[in-house]
């Protein structure tokens, strides 16, 4: 009997979550207006995943941002799509194997925006800089499938 009650409770929770769950009771869009999100910020004048690119997107009228984060060796959360530093910065090596103090002066956008490079943004700094009314979709990057630390 207890198994039936637990199974029923599980099914009810699953149905409730699937059909009735809403993030923070916030209306994200209506049928007439889809939610348009700036993917990694607006990259027209600034490197992606930088505070400058997020502010640029907000100034352009975006009400939602998508940003990628990963964890450094010392536990800081930084905004970067890639683990390898060479792809989008003047750094060398892997972000997850480096302490934030080693990464904080690295310039992002050396290939895409050489006249407007920016430092790596920490998630904490982004949350302090971005207005509270902006919806954030934070994509957590993990180096392996089961790395959720």
Describe the function of each predicted region.
Residues 2-23, 81-149:
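Metal-dependent phosphodiesterase/phospholipase catalytic core, i.e.
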Residues 16-19, 42-60, 118:
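Short, motif-level signal for alpha-helix interfacial/capping segments enriched in acidic residues
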Residues 19-38, 42-44, 51:
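N-terminal signal-anchor transmembrane helix
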Residues 35-37, 64, 135-137:
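Structural preference for beta-strand elements that scaffold enzyme active sites
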Residues 40, 67-69, 138-140:
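A cross-domain feature marking catalytic cores of carbohydrate-active enzymes
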Residues 44, 73, 144:
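Feature marks short, surface-exposed loop/turn motifs that line or immediately flank catalytic pockets
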Residues 53-71, 126:
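Catalytic domains of carbohydrate-active enzymes, especially glycoside hydrolases
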